[in-house]
Amino acid sequence: MNSIHSANSNTVSTSEINTSQIPTDSLESIRNRLNQVHLSLRKLSDQINHHNRHPNKVKLPNYAQFQNQFQVLLTQLHTITSDLENNDELLKNTNVYPLPSFPTTQQEGLITTLLRKKPLPEVDEWIESAIDKRKNEYVNVQKDDEFAQWCLTKIEELREDFQFYGFNSVEELKYLDSEDEKKETEENKKIENQKYEEELKITAGGKSGLHPNRVLKFMCQGVLT
């Protein structure tokens, strides 16, 4: 079963970590309920698979037994749903590990180390050192979230005051329309054409190499045009 690490979004002191607001009992209840559902489904699956492997020796449970097992499952799922709804805000700020994709079988030793409740001695020293260095500092996660939301709102307000029609500023657009820019563009085209002709002479069969933009498009989109 995955281990649960809760990140409290209230103001906390790094020197005195307050875990009183973490509903440990509720989280433990959710974990136990999930484990019960897992065991119930596992039992039902084993009964069906055992019958499939030995159809002449083992009979499937009767209808009443199936109904009772499903009723137990529904009750367990209802309880889990209720617990999840009651702790919705907390679970939004909760990190669950390891991820489902973690190779638990191949990395059994590592997973045991990761899920141990007591920190390693060197980790204890690191924690104590960090607390000593920042004992007079405070972390306000909620204030950081409010600042991030303010930045997003401000950006949206500023964006409404501008109209975007491209990647060039007004000064750059004026320069693009000037005679100097037109001459520079023509010179760049001549240089590019000269490079293209030189590549035709170098490459086998007289074929030119791919333009960097086409290479990047193929790498990002898998399209070669």
From Swiss-Prot:
Disulfide bridges in this chain: none
Gene3D superfamilies (alphabetical): 1.20.58.1710, 6.10.250.2610
Pfam families found in the cross-reference section: Med8
Subcellular location(s) of the protein: Nucleus
Top-level division of the source organism's lineage: Eukaryota
Record bears the keyword Transcription regulation: yes
Disordered as annotated region, ranges: 1-24
The keyword Manganese belongs to this UniProt entry's keyword annotation: no
GO cellular component: core mediator complex; mediator complex
GO biological process, one term: regulation of transcription by RNA polymerase II
GO molecular function: RNA polymerase II cis-regulatory region sequence-specific DNA binding; transcription coregulator activity
InterPro entries: Mediatior_Med8_fun/met (IPR019364)
UniProt feature coiled coil, ranges: 170-204
Keyword tags: Activator, Coiled coil, Nucleus, Transcription, Transcription regulation
Major subcellular location class: nucleus
UniProt similarity note: Belongs to the Mediator complex subunit 8 family.
PANTHER family assigned: MEDIATOR OF RNA POLYMERASE II TRANSCRIPTION SUBUNIT 8
Job of this protein: Component of the Mediator complex, a coactivator involved in the regulated transcription of nearly all RNA polymerase II-dependent genes. Mediator functions as a bridge to convey information from gene-specific regulatory proteins to the basal RNA polymerase II transcription machinery. Mediator is recruited to promoters by direct interactions with regulatory proteins and serves as a scaffold for the assembly of a functional preinitiation complex with RNA polymerase II and the general transcription factors.
Quaternary organization: Component of the Mediator complex.
Identification of the protein by name: Mediator of RNA polymerase II transcription subunit 8
Organism name: Debaryomyces hansenii (strain ATCC 36239 / CBS 767 / BCRC 21394 / JCM 1990 / NBRC 0083 / IGC 2968)
Lineage: Eukaryota, Fungi, Dikarya, Ascomycota, Saccharomycotina
Gene name as annotated: MED8
